[in-house]
């Protein structure tokens, strides 16, 4: 199965393509525009290019969740709009591709990265970069590291099925 994993942002979105258990390609789509809608178009167009280049069967996206207490509503809204833009792209042009969403705590746990109360976001980003360097032998920025971690969590899922044979 060919999998595209995404760590979405309207300024710098990390992505990774896995074919089976192999990391096949990765990168980052960036935009410095001050216009939010233009940034969303740039991100969506970049993802469309990746989908046209690779035969993707499934996309896994880091779920958007407002920070409890100190949430930045404007940022949350922008990320939700970006997710919607990608959902429309998939629906309209790549309708055989599945989209799934995963919470950061879930994919990090699957990668063996300790997270939860008391661990700062900045520390987690560095742990993600270190995980990718140790697991794949590559040095990447935190956006790409997150995308690779998201994909890794999917390709290394343990089956809970019981084999009765």
Predicted segments with their positions:
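Phosphate- and other anionic-substrate recognition elements at nucleic-acid/protein interfaces
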Residues: 1-165
């Amino acid at each position: 199965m060919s999998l595209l994993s995404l760590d979405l942002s309207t300024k710098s979105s990390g992505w990774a393509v896995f074919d089976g258990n192999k990391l096949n390609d990765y990168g980052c789509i960036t935009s410095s525009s001050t216009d939010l809608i233009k940034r969303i178009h740039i991100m969506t167009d970049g993802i469309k290019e990746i989908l046209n280049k690779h035969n993707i069967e499934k996309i896994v996206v880091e779920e958007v969740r407002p920070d409890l207490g100190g949430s930045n509503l404007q940022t949350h809204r922008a990320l939700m709009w970006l997710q919607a833009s990608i959902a429309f792209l998939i629906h309209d042009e790549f309708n055989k591709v599945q989209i799934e969403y995963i919470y950061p705590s879930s994919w990090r746990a699957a990668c063996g990265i300790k997270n939860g109360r008391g661990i700062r976001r900045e520390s987690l980003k560095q742990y993600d970069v270190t995980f990718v360097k140790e697991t794949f032998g590559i040095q990447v920025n935190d956006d790409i590291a997150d995308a690779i971690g998201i994909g890794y969590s999917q390709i290394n899922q343990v089956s809970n099925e019981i084999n009765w044979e």
